[in-house]
Amino acid sequence: MKTLVSQAVSRLARWGTKWSLWPPHLVTACCGVEVGHLFGSAYDAERFGMLPMGSLRQSNILIIEGTITLKMAKFVKYIYEQMPEPKYVVAMGACAIKGGVFYGSYHMVPAAKVLPVHAYVSGCPPTPEGRPKSRDEGPGADSPCRKLSGPST
């Protein structure tokens, strides 16, 4: 009986963790302003269970906004390794996805070469219209990364 209750509680905790995203964001470019809009009154990401966190050890989704340089890549990987499971990565903006204006530069690394990226939000900087588009291009329908773009229309 004790193991049955323990398994049920464990399953409930995993489900709650999966659908309660606590994202810090790694701001290295202008896309950081757009993430601020997510937590503002217009989009109110908190109604979907997303709370902005300052500590990476309590977060389970990392939003990369901007370029990752060669020097910064090992630190970004270290940050990702500190996050608890389940953990997700979102590449936001042209700089994080392909390099933006720095494309082809010797010191720039796309986010997908450093970490496993689960969702992409395109644009420079991504507009509010770009986030719903990411719902259709991202991972499966049950992915918590889809919460970034709010309810589908």
Model regions and ranges:
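N-terminal, charge-rich interaction modules
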Residues: 1-58
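C-terminal functional extensions of proteins
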Residues: 111-153
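Cofactor-cradling patches in redox/metallo enzymes
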Residues: 33-37, 41, 46-114, 121-130
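Generic serine detector
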Residues: 6, 10, 20, 41, ...
